[in-house]
Structures are given as structure tokens and as C-alpha cells.
Curated annotation (Swiss-Prot):
Pathway: Protein modification; protein ubiquitination. Keywords: Acetylation, Apoptosis, Coiled coil, Cytoplasm, Metal-binding, Nucleus, Phosphoprotein, Transferase, Ubl conjugation pathway, Zinc, Zinc-finger. The lineage of its organism: Eukaryota, Metazoa, Chordata, Craniata, Vertebrata. InterPro entries: B30.2/SPRY (IPR001870), B30.2/SPRY_sf (IPR043136), Butyrophylin_SPRY (IPR003879), ConA-like_dom_sf (IPR013320), PRY (IPR006574), SPRY_dom (IPR003877), TRIM/RBCC (IPR050143), Znf-RING_euk (IPR027370). This is E3 ubiquitin-protein ligase TRIM35.
Amino acid sequence: MERSPDVSPGPSRSFKEELLCAVCYDPFRDAVTLRCGHNFCRGCVSRCWEVQVSPTCPVCKDRASPADLRTNHTLNNLVEKLLREEAEGARWTSYRFSRVCRLHRGQLSLFCLEDKELLCCSCQADPRHQGHRVQPVKDTAHDFRAKCRNMEHALREKAKAFWAMRRSYEAIAKHNQVEAAWLEGRIRQEFDKLREFLRVEEQAILDAMAEETRQKQLLADEKMKQLTEETEVLAHEIERLQMEMKEDDVSFLMKHKSRKRRLFCTMEPEPVQPGMLIDVCKYLGSLQYRVWKKMLASVELPFSFDPNTAAGWLSVSDDLTSVTNHGYRVQVENPERFSSAPCLLGSRVFSQGSHAWEVALGGLQSWRVGVVRVRQDSGAEGHSHSCYHDTRSGFWYVCRTQGVEGDHCVTSDPATSPLVLAIPRRLRVELECEEGELSFYDAERHCHLYTFHARFGEVRPYFYLGGARGAGPPEPLRICPLHISVKEELDG
């Protein structure tokens, strides 16, 4: 039952004063009674006695002892009741004044819909609220409660959305753990291949150097053997010449002609043959560059498929070079993934230079191959939820589609008519960023199909792979190996 605003629920002032400690003048806390009959807080009287030689009552000064302290349960109960009633009185006063107009002291029975304020009957005539829509509190509360129920429903839906988003992040975290383990193994395999390539190259260079060293050592040994033999011949000739010089004059001169002819036939020493030193530059000169070029020759693909952009219909091979449409399967949600069509992107972003790639289409009956502009605000993933893939939305491609008179090739430019060309089984794409040209060729027939002219900006390779029309197994779309060359420019 609601109390009248005129009734005061609080205790009398004199009664409250009887429940105050004579030391701290606050309501008793753990009240105790001395032998003389006076009451104090246990803590207050204990602090007073700490500075006294002989404990006495703080009021009448009678002698006392800590052993005389007796807990006064009745007084403690009265203090607890007093504090409880004061708290209740404070709440009642707050409640009573919160429902009364502070300006006119009237009952708050109206609500201003413009100012969103509670009003009394006198406030309604106030100039500040003239012309405003005013409703009774009960009606307004009913309307606002209905709105709050709608807000509650909206908040519950938002909470469900947050919970669904949390489950999405849980799925992403689990996917990343599995993907990281698989990716770690693949990375190690690829680096093992690189290390094996470098090991083979290192061994080949060391073997070539060892073979050159062996050949030049054999040549040096042969030359040294020849020189040793010639030296021995000359030593024998010197010894013979010394003996002839000791003979008498007639004998010495008789042998002069044959001696001169013999000495003339002795060989002259040849200079050191060129190329006898190990060719250091052959093995160390630009070694890293030469090995890098050789390594580059083993790289056959200009880019790979990006599985993070692949729609739920598509499955990308482990080596990221082929993609197949196996029908829709639930994938981890991420903003980069296409959701409205079976599309995916290449791993590279092209903004300058010349680039080319070839795609094996085989007997695929529904495909698109081209590029898509990378949006500056959100990247290529800004296109992932778009249903309109044409030049107006940043897509440039050639595709195979069904027509009344059979399949034919068309472009993403709605202004062009269908291309009257045979369906290519292998498509070559050439992108000239600076020239603003994107050309398509039938790689098997070596014929030009179509060329877009536009300011492309930053683009990524774009692919669409429709489902199989027949009952046979789905065919993959593959990026074809190409020979990658390096253009060398020398300064000056």
C-alpha cells in the first residue's frame, strides 16, 4: 500500500540521540556497557584506555576494567533498526520527490512527446510546452514499453548476429589451424625442392671445376715431363761440349761443323701456354645471378589461383594451378570469397608492365577468363558479393555462353556483339598495363579474339567456372606452364 506523502516514516530526534556514542557521536558500533552503566562503542572505549594509566569511564570517570565490558545486544539491535529505518526513509523521500514536479510541486501525470519530459497539470500551461503533443503518463508508458519490446527484439537479433559472427571466427580459427599445418608441410616441400636444386647446381659447378682442375693438371704434368726430358738432353749436350773443348785444336776444329749443326737443332723453350689457370670468373662470376636465372627457368607459372577467393562451388588443387566445379559446399566465410557466382581470382596484382598467361579450357562448357579491377577502398574482395560482372563494374573478360544457335564467345562489354569465332580450348591473355590493352588469343589456332582498351589501374586475373551440363565428371580449368624470361638492361 502506497504511503501518503505527508507521513514521516523516520524515528524521533530525541530517540536517535540516545543511540549515539558519547565518544564518536555516531550510532553505536558493537555497543558495550561499563560497570557504571554508561554505553560506548567497543573500539572507542578501547582507544581511550590505550592512553590512560588506569582505565576510567569516559563520562563519569569511575574506575573500569576491560574485563567489565559487556556486549549490549539490545542497544545493538536498536541501532541496527534505526539505520534500517533511516535508509528506508531516505528511499521513500527520494521516491516521493521523484514523482513530484520540482517547479509546481504537482503530481507528474503527463508526458511531453517533443521535449521527452514528465509534466504536471500546471506545466502543460507553461509557454515552454505550448503547442507540444502531451499524453497521459499511462498511455505514454504503454507506447514506450511497446517500443522497448521492439528494441529488445532488435537487440536479441543483434545478439544472435554477434553470436553467429563469433561462430564464423571460431570456424576461421579452426580452418587456419588446419590450413597452417598443411601449409607448413607444403612450404617445407617447396623449400626442400629449392635446396635440392641448389645442391645439384652446387655439385655440378664443383664437378665442372674439379674436371677443369684435373685436365689442366694433366696438361701441366705433360708439359713438365717434356721440359724435364729437354733439360736432360741439354745437360748431356753441355757435358759433351765441355769434353770437346778440352781436345787439341785440330780435333776440336774437325768437329766444328757437326757440332754447330747439332747445337742448332736443340729446341727453344716455349712460353707458358695460355689458359692454364683455373677460370675463376667462370665459376664465381655472377654466380648467384646465373643460378637465379636457371632457377627462374624452372618456374613455369606466372601466378596461381587464390583459394581464399574461391566460391563454395570451386575446389582448388593443392598446387594451386587448377580449379574444378564440384557443386556448392559450405566454406569458411571471409569477405574475399565470391558468394554469388562460382568465381575466383589469381594470386598476382598487375598495375604496370607486360604480362601474359594461358589457360587450358578443354571441353568446359561455361567459363570466363579475364581481369577484375582492384578497388582502392576494399580491394578485389569488394566485387565478391556483386551480381553484375561486366565492364561497368570493373570486369574485362571473354566467356563461353549458350545461345539460340549454339555456344559462342562473348565479352563482358555489353556494347559488343557475340564474337563469331570457334570456341578456344586454350586461351592466351596478354595485358599491357601502360598501353591500356587486354588481348585474348586462341593459343592453339594462334588467332586473335578480342582486345579491350581501357585504363585498368590495378587488376587481378579473374576466372569463372560453371557447372558441368552432362553427367560426366567435372573438368578442371588449369593455368598452363609458360617459359618465363628475364629482360636484361645494361646502364650506359
